[in-house]
Amino acid sequence: MKPNINLGDKSKFVAWGTNGMKNCLDHCKLILKRHGLTEFGISSKMYTLLMEDGNKLSYACNNPKEMYEEAINCIDRHLEAGRPIIVGVNHTFGNKYNDGTTDHFVVIYGREYDGKHYNYLYYEVGKTNVAAGFNDKENRFVYDTTNPDKPQFYDEKSSRSDQARFDVIQVRPNY
């Protein structure tokens, strides 16, 4: 079993609209900067897990088990080295942001085991107040390997006003 890690720090959270910023990726980069990082979210080295396929998500490769394991290992390496990491999520079909699939970016800062799954804690940069954006109990992705050949990495009920599910579709290493 992997040890729990929590690098979260509410003083490092950047609320939506800080200094007039209205870009979630910029918010994520500022959070990483506050954590002492100088390189963050390198898109050329990202792991792509899912892609939109009409009104559903499909695995981005022929071997999703291997790709998810590599992406989770990347996240774990970052956390174990004391470095939070940016991930892209999908919450709405048909948005044409970024690569046509990523609707939003958040920063993973922790890992916990609940006896069944590993949960990854994240800063929700789309929030204007710290209590909602930095919430260990609510802002967490489940890494679900119940079906090992079809892993999932999601937050079933995000803190968005519509409580849309967040599916992690990209992992962006910091190096």
In which residue ranges do the predicted regions lie?
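Residues that form generic nucleotide/phosphate-binding pockets
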Residues: 31, 74, 78, 156, ...
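Active-site-adjacent substructure of cysteine-protease-like catalytic cores
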Residues: 68-123
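Short, flexible/disordered intra-domain loops and linkers
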Residues: 60-64, 95-101, 132-136
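Cysteine-nucleophile protease catalytic domains, especially the papain-like/related folds used
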Residues: 1-74
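Noncatalytic regulatory segments and standalone regulatory/sensor domains
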Residues: 2-18, 38, 111-175
